[in-house]
Amino acid sequence: MFTLAEVASLNDIQPTYRILKPWWDVFMDYLAVVMLMVAIFAGTMQLTKDQVVCLPVLPSPANSKAHTPPGNADVTTEVPKMETATPQDQNGQTTNDIAFGTSAVTPDIPLQATYSHAESTFPSQETKKEKRDPTGRKTNLDFQQYVFINQMCYHLALPWYSKYFPYLALIHTIILMVSSNFWFKYPKTCSKVEHFVSILGKCFESPWTTKALSETACEDSEENKQRITGAQTLPKHVSTSSDEGSPSASTPMINKTGFKFSAEKPVIEVPSMTILDKKDGEQAKALFEKVRKFRAHVEDSDLIYKLYVVQTLIKTAKFIFILCYTANFVNAISFEHVCKPKVEHLTGYEVFECTHNMAYMLKKLLISYISIICVYGFICLYTLFWLFRIPLKEYSFEKVREESSFSDIPDVKNDFAFLLHMVDQYDQLYSKRFGVFLSEVSENKLREISLNHEWTFEKLRQHVSRNAQDKQELHLFMLSGVPDAVFDLTDLDVLKLELIPEAKIPAKISQMTNLQELHLCHCPAKVEQTAFSFLRDHLRCLHVKFTDVAEIPAWVYLLKNLRELYLIGNLNSENNKMIGLESLRELRHLKILHVKSNLTKVPSNITDVAPHLTKLVIHNDGTKLLVLNSLKKMMNVAELELQNCELERIPHAIFSLSNLQELDLKSNSIRTIEEIISFQHLKRLTCLKLWHNKIVAIPPSITHVKNLESLYFSNNKLESLPVAVFSLQKLRCLDVSYNNISTIPIEIGLLQNLQHLHITGNKVDVLPKQLFKCVKLRTLNLGQNCIASLPEKISQLSQLTQLELKGNCLDRLPAQLGQCRMLKKSGLVVEDQLFDTLPLEVKEALNQDVNVPFANGI
């Protein structure tokens, strides 16, 4: 047999789940325990004391003659009256006995013989027989026959509900218990509930929750202009229990001290007593991450809500079923029953009168059970009314938003909303504290505090370095925000912020008087009004790297004193079919615009800065640039770079740029440059870069571009150099590296102003003597060719500082290299074995590039 405690354990849940048990569930749990006690009590009584007692219904005296027990044909049917003897004992006491005879319970002896035997045995009683009245009737049944009849009538005459009521009540109660707590046991919902309760308890006990709510209280007091006097200490409650459930009852109340924090309002000074330590901050940040992931996981489905509705419907249907059939059996339970077991051949009687000793008790227990189940059912109906009266799959934190400064707490839905509704039935303070961890403002404030703890002024100072321009530079990468101490580095020149999505630039940036360059790499920084005013007046160079054009901060287009703007990102993605740059009209002093993107046309907004723009760079990452009409309006552009734009010819719009000085068309698909003759109208053009294309020949018309000083044709498919190139008397730099050129024309000697010649990666085998007439050469790169010997006239290049010979067929170097006084070992690129062929004094002269300056100093 089981105990009450063992069965009641079906109704037990983890103590931490009690926050998800509204009052009706708790009440129904107690009612289920009472019903369980009724069922077990009734079952115990029935097993121990349930009994049916039956007596045969004897024929009446008037009909006794017609009654003859089977098997005794000679038995007299007259039922004699029972005699009572009252003999006196020796002490004078009188006893009353009923004279049944010794054969009264012997069915095989005829009644007449029994009476005759009695008369012969007790002759003295015969004279008193007529004077006494009969007090009972004989049945002639044996004890075993009574037991047999009792068992037969218990199963035949007794209603089934009287026999099985305790067991049915027990089964029904167990089903109700299981139905009430099934959502706590079902694996797919149990895991979510367990996770939710764990997070909820941690959020309730978190010092950050206490701090945040304290800030809210402080803000309310500020708004109401209520002065708080006295220094009150905000207690910080940290749970040391291993249980991750609901918070302890000893959680301290929240004092109205701290600082005011609002997403839209300035933050007042933070008292040191409310600052979280590093451990508390890390725990709070972990909670924000857990809440975010849990919300994303639970909001996807409404399984918990549906399961709770289903189990409530099951309990309601169970209540209706129990009430319907039990009400019909209340009157069926009675004390007396008539039994006709059809065992006349065994007992001699056909009808028996029986009594059920547990009838009154069972009837009272049944009425009690029905009363309890009615109360249980009404609560189920109320639960259904509550479930369908309000939208439980939506939960609004509107009240919390009104009472606190966290106006960004989002509304939730589905199972997440349902769980919060259930928690509100327990205590609304849980949801209020939980909402703090749904607020991005709260999370950002926590990150800001933790960030300022970690990145102190001293630590930031250690990360300051000097860049190639000898400027002090600070690079911050993948932080949760910009530390406040950054703005105390007043001597900083360059600030780089990379992958800081929540970057905010406060008014303190106005202290950084030396700051002129700012880098925002995937960092849509927000600025305060005072900070914007400072940047607008002082910032000179801005680099913005983005994935989508929406990441470009709007204030970028309002920096009126900006000189250089670098935009690197996708301006023509699927989400941005049209160019997304805003108007650049406010950039009144912009001189350099660098755009690295995937444009299909030159943005028309660029014309807003046309009057003062001097340099335009477009790196298109292989996307074909189709429309360049806007270039015609860039009349003051001196430098133009169109790289990786898949251009097949030189755009005609370029020929309208009368002030153009440098043109770079690197990494396109240009094959012919017949339009080069049009460059003669660009009187100021001095540098032409057509490198990394597919050009197979340089047209003779290049001779008309007489002002060219630099010409780059490297990484093309040139097989020869036309004589016209050498008519450019102002040419100072000629780069034809990595082509298929096999000979250098002797006309190269005409380039008297040539200072840099690059022929690396060709098929040149002989160097013409006229080359060495270019006495102003400083750089001569001849590597990776087929040159077999270096002429001794190399000595004429007295200004040579760099000579590349590596990758040729040379077997020795001429000693005349020593006469190139400006050439040093660092500028000579050659194999080590070739360098060793030089005379010792030449090698020593070449090695003096390091020692000579120090020697002169000494």
Swiss-Prot record:
Name of the protein described by the UniProt record: Volume-regulated anion channel subunit LRRC8D
Any one Gene Ontology BP term: protein hexamerization
Major subcellular site: membrane
Residue positions, PTM Phosphoserine: S241, S242, S246
Reactions listed under catalytic activity: chloride(in) = chloride(out); iodide(out) = iodide(in); taurine(out) = taurine(in)
UniProt key word Hydrolase: no
Taxonomic source organism: Rattus norvegicus
An annotated Gene Ontology molecular function: volume-sensitive anion channel activity
Gene: Lrrc8d
